[in-house]
Each structure stands twice: as structure tokens, then as C-alpha cells.
Amino acid sequence: LTTLHQRGALIKVHGGAAAAESETMTRDADLSLRSTLNKEEKAVIGKYAAGLIREEDFVYLDAGSSVDVMIDYITETGALYVTNAVSHAQKLLKKGMRVFLIGGELKAVTEAIVGAEAVEGLKKYHFTKGFFGTNGADAVSGYTTPDITEALVKEKAMQQCRKCYVLADASK
């Protein structure tokens, strides 16, 4: 997988790989566009996911529009939150939550913090729960994202979680 990824033939993701040939697999949609899609489904998913958080939890919140909607429903102020999304950190802070933002490169299109520094920073955390977005889901490839720098952050964050939840609507 690593060799094929280095050649650009596939994109490595947690649990597998995705084809690198299609246009949709090589580009991220702008966050402002993604936040307008499938609002009702994301609201149902987000409300359910937020209800899984307990006071004693140490929670990782991945960047993305589905997790952004989830934050609207988070009420647990006793939990501790870590994220790789500046917008998520700001929303949590406004709600009175204690939040940490990992370091790294800020990616303009998705507003996610990515890169080697982000991956390295995640190593010091051990989360009870993690909530993740995805660009796609496939029975063969698993969960996919078109950007290797985001995939590596997701992979490391998932490794650091006791329980992982992927928030995905039917369009994935």
C-alpha cells in the first residue's frame, strides 16, 4: 500500500486504501459548501452522536461538516475536547467547553489542521471517544478522504481512541 500511495496510484486511509483516479477522490469540497448539504441527516446523526458523550470523556473531534453539526448538540461541559479544526474549537469555546487545538498546518479548503506536526501532537493523547467525518464510505475501501495529510491525522487520532465513531450520511 505504501509503495502504491507514493506512486499516486491510491490514497492510504485508516483500515485500507481508496482509488486515486476519480476527480471526487482527488479534491475536497469547500467546507462552506459541504455544510449546506444533507442538513437534516447530519442533524439527526449529530444529535445522536453528541448524546454519546459523558462527563468523564476525553473526546477527539475531527474536522468536517458532520462533526460541526454535532457540536451544535453537545451539552456535556464536564468532558474535555481536542480537535484539529479551528472552527470547532471556537464553537466549543463559545459553549463554555474546555478545548485543546492540535498544532500543525492549517489547510485552507477544509479548515483542518494537518501534517506531520499534527500527527506527532496526537501521540500524547489517549481519548475515550473520537468522532470523525469522512468524504466517502465503501465496503471494500472503508472510509476515504482525498487528502493524504488529513488521512494521516485521522488514522493517528483513531489509533489514540478507545472508541471511534464515523459520522456519515447516506451520500457517503
Regions found by a protein language model. Name each.
Residues 1-60, 71-80, 93-97:
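HTH-adjacent hinge/linker in prokaryotic transcriptional regulators
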Residues 65, 86-87:
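Alpha-helix/helix-capping structural signal
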Residues 20-22, 64, 102, 134-135:
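Generic beta-structure capping elements
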Residues 59-61, 80-84, 166-168:
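Short, hydrophobic beta-strand segments that form beta-sheet elements in well-ordered domains
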Residues 2-5, 12, 87-172:
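Conserved phosphate- and dinucleotide-binding cores of soluble alpha/beta proteins
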Residues 66-70:
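Short glycine/serine/threonine-rich phosphate/pyrophosphate-binding segments
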